[in-house]
Amino acid sequence: MELLKGNAVNLNDTAYYNNRELSWLAFNERVLQEAQDANNPLLERLKFISIFSSNLDEFFMVRVAGLKDQVSAGFNQPENKAGLTPKKQLNKIAIKAHALMTVQYDTFKNYVLPALELEGIERLTFNDLTKEQREFIEEYFDEQIFPVLTPVAIDAYRPFPMLLNKSLNLATLLYDEKQAEEENRTKLGIVQVPSLLERFIILPSEGQKHKFILLEDVISSFTHKLFTGYTVSSVTRFRITRNADLTIHEEGARDLLKVIEKELKKRKWGAAVRLEVGKEHIDERVLALLYEVLEVKDEDVYIMDGPLDLTCLFSLYKKLAPLYEHLVYPALIPQPPQDLGDEEDVFEKAIEHDILLHHPFESFQPVVDFVRDAADDPNVLAIKQTLYRVSGDSPIIQALKIAAEKGKQVTVLVELKARFDEENNVHWAKELEQAGCHVIYGVSHLKTHSKITLVVRRKNGKIERFVHLGTGNYNDATAKLYTDFGYITSRKDFGVDATNFFNYLSGYTTKPHFHHLSVAPFDIREQFMDLIDEEIRYHRQYGNGYIIAKMNSLTDKPLIKKMYEASQAGVKVELIVRGTCCLRPGIPNVSENIRVVSVVGRYLEHSRIYYFHHNGEEKIYLSSADLMTRNMEKRVEISFPILDIEMKARIKAILQLILADNVKTREQNKDGDYYYVINGSTEEIDSQVKLFKMAYQNTDAE
């Protein structure tokens, strides 16, 4: 009878869903909690403040900008989950974002800065400087800063300039006593703080102390040198965040590379979506003018009590970390993979058995070696790879270029539409083409987000295929910071699937046949819907239905509704969702059998793992895809099964360890709010630290 009652519930009820944007802000709040956590090393807390700022910048440039575009276009339809119109979403975002930024500045000013001072790291303002320090700073300004600055006067002939996205600016009110008429005596000048100059200027100080002054403090103090003949009456600091969402019209685009290069130039000058103003020295006349010229409303304006643009704290972290090792995380070195010895040949090992890699606990080097060794191997005929985000000096790109120069058939899909990596990827696409690689840009109207490499080798007259599949990017830099899985196999069916997949990307093929791969936008959603339905059937028959799903974000309504159906049927569902989660757990007759946790800690949880008990058969899939509508419909994604029994047991044990985390885990309640998990055991379990310890133990055991 309970099930009938559950089925009578309307699963479209907006009370059962979290709004996507507000859920994302709740995730960024968890990032901010890491800055507030006194158990974290002090400089790491500084870095989390910077990450929070960087995340929020992108959120305004893309998500808030998109909602503002909808409002401007007169679109007022409520979104399909929580039922909020674009206008309501913007109102709620403004309230939450103002509150979070206030907490951020309070954390920085009243907790982190005083703690840094106790360590001998101190921010000084111009008024705090000694005579010797003032002389040093004036000379530094004259020689290093002044030649780079461009003072811009605002008058009838020189209108308010178009200021760069995310640039820090000084609005200077000037007084001209020589003017006869009072109304002509006040002038306005704008000075952009150059982003290429060092933001933190280290001052001469005694002993081991590190005292610094901010670049904008120095420029503000010497503004009179830029506007000679005028009296400086005020200097107001402000920063603009602009709409940076690219509009790419792929229909009829003969050269996508050129279209994207053209659009990238516009990104710097989009409409203002946020105005940040420094509270100290604020001039109300300047503020009124900024409102007018930028066309912003009260909810778009953030008056902050401290330095603007705290993303800059990352550069301070990098400057101080080598000098204050006790204030950063202890070094943890990725270990040789469990399935691959230190010096073993990755291809020969893959012929023996499948290889599972768990980064950053296990080294990313075998993935680099996989491509590099293929480039050097005279028996290798072809290398095919998808690239979404790569590092600035990528060893994988270098290996692909070498392979092409050696005459191998090298095909690289470079995703030009990877947000905020477009410029980088345009650069790599050109370099790869010049080296002789066959570069493709993917499928029209879809982002290729899948992570796959195929190596084709002819040995002793036989063709062999080796495949690497991953949950994360081919990026050796982020592989040290993101948790991800990689999988290397020589199984014939996987090789055939990889060949068919690349032919689909490069040719006019419709959906190919796959033995093991599921590919979005074709069938990943359908596959997971079927798997959940099977779990419901098994639960009704045997009472042992159990699903674990780990991902970055969960927003897809059909899949959320299917999970609600599983909960109503009694299936136990445990979700590890780091970021946005539109599903609400613990609602009677809807989701009381669902638990949602989020782990935010030292490493960014990035792996996508989907586990189905399947009456003891235990099906496990790894994927490049989160359970988001965009991943199901607008991206080329791959989901693949783990077939090896030992590997499945290992992945399940990792999932259970993450679910047992009682240090970095927050749990979502039925109202959509997150709380730290109450530690019910005597042992503190930080899953990320524990996984590193296990990797070290495996190395020692060998």
UniProtKB/Swiss-Prot annotation:
* This protein's record includes keyword Transferase: yes
* Cofactor or coenzyme needed: Mg(2+)
Which residues of this UniProt protein bind Mg(2+)?
A: 389, 419
Q: Which GO biological-process labels does this protein carry?
A: polyphosphate biosynthetic process
Binding of ATP occurs at: 55, 482, 578, 606
The protein's PTM annotation reads: An intermediate of this reaction is the autophosphorylated ppk in which a phosphate is covalently linked to a histidine residue through a N-P bond.
* One Gene Ontology cellular component annotation held by this UniProt entry: membrane
Could you tell me what reaction this enzyme catalyses?
A: [phosphate](n) + ATP = [phosphate](n+1) + ADP
EC number of this enzyme: 2.7.4.1
What molecular function terms (GO) are annotated for this protein? ATP binding; metal ion binding; polyphosphate kinase activity
Q: Which domain of life is it from?
A: Bacteria
Instruction: Identify the catalytic residues.
Output: 449
InterPro entries reported for this sequence: PP_kinase (IPR003414), PP_kinase_C_1 (IPR041108), PP_kinase_middle (IPR024953), PP_kinase_middle_dom_sf (IPR036830), PPK_C_dom2 (IPR025200), PPK_N_dom (IPR025198), PPK_N_dom_sf (IPR036832)
The UniProt family comment states: Belongs to the polyphosphate kinase 1 (PPK1) family.
Q: What does this protein do?
A: Catalyzes the reversible transfer of the terminal phosphate of ATP to form a long-chain polyphosphate (polyP).
Q: Which HAMAP family does the record associate with it?
A: Polyphosphate_kinase
Annotated protein name in UniProt:
Polyphosphate kinase
